[in-house]
Structures are given as C-alpha cells and as structure tokens.
Amino acid sequence: MQPDPAAIVETLSIGEPLIGLYDAPDPAPFAPLVEPGAGRECVFASYARWREGKTLHLTKEKHGCGAPQLLGVRGRSREQMVKFLVDEEGLRASHELMDLWLDAAPGYQPRHEHILIGPLKAAQYDYLRSVTFYVNADQLAVLVTGSSYYSRPDDPPVVAPFSSGCGQLASVFGDFDVPQAIVGATDQAMRKHLEPGLLAFTVTKPMFELLCRWADDPASSLHNNFLRQLITARGGSF
C-alpha cells in the first residue's frame, strides 16, 4: 500500500505534483496518457502535462530521448556517445574519462514493456520504482535532512550523481530495494523545461516509505523549532 506523503507536502508547502516512475505491464491504469513528440524529445518536455495530471508513456517504439537511460535502447554506438558527450557537450575533459564514467553507471533494466512517468497512482504502487519531489532550496534542505533520519554514518543516503535528467530518475540507483535519494535536475539540457528555482529530489520506494514514516514522527526534524523558524522567516510558507 502506498504511504501518504500529505504531511510532507502540506508542511513544506510543496506545490508541484509528486512524480512517479513506473515500470508496468499495462499502461491503461495510468490514463490520461501522452506520448513523446517526434525525434529525441526530452522526457521533461512533458513537465507541463504532468502538472495537468497526465502521464508520459514510453516504449521501445516511442521513447523520445529517454530510451538509453530508461528502456535499454541504444540510439548511438558507445564511441558516438562518448564523442557527443565530450566533444559537443563538454561534460568531461577527455574521452577516456567519459568512458570510465559510463562504465561505472549502474544502468536501468526495465521489467516490463511500458515506462510511465507522471503523478502518483496509489493503486499502481506495486510498479513504482522512484518518486520525485520538485522543490526549491528550502524544501530540498528539509528533505535531505529527513532522508538521514534512519541512516547509519557509513551508509550516506543522499548523493548527487552525474547523469542525464531522465537517468537521475532511475538508472543511477542500481539497487531499488535500498533506501536511496539523489539530488537531481542538474542536467543543463533538461533544465529549460523547469522553473529556474526547482531542483529534483528523487527517491527509491523504500526511501519514500521511510520519509513518510519520518513525517509522521512528531519527534522528527519535520516538526522542530528550526523548521518553524525557517517557515516564519519565509513569510509563513515555502
């Protein structure tokens, strides 16, 4: 059963919808659906449609730019990809370095034929792989702190990995059964689809469940004086 994130959303005044990435056998329960536009349209070109309650539907036949990261479909050879990322995008100082980074990336192997990205669907919780909070800096600070509530010092729960924007939704996690969180929306190519002050905080399903537990604990940092003082300093709301 999907836990209720209402305490987080309401306390932090999160105005953007929480966005789930689902790996499912049937897209019908996620309607209304939208498909990526022609060519290599960015996954985040659908952001305005997520706000309208619609879900982006990706398949190996219709996938836009997200195919390599979310569906395992390779549009370019490895050599072409390295050349593009280094020579055109300037993301690493050399081809050799970029090769090392690509080798180290966990990657994502879909379980089903349909990847669906859109507002949370409680009835489809079995197929949920990650949840993304689109937040400002204050909201992000509170969520980063909350994600450490149950963690050990030798197991840092939050990272900010290198990847494309869509890769930060799934392919950087590796093990989805572990509570993990990432600070995302750091890909310059996708940021034009977001408002300037927004960043992404993407979590695995186990971390989402822990965050909801954290929010329900009256002794947690979501209910402390420092947060109340911060909210007051911001005029009563984030």
Q: What is the predicted function of each stretch?
A:
Residues 2-238:
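Acidic, serine/proline-rich low-complexity intrinsically disordered regions
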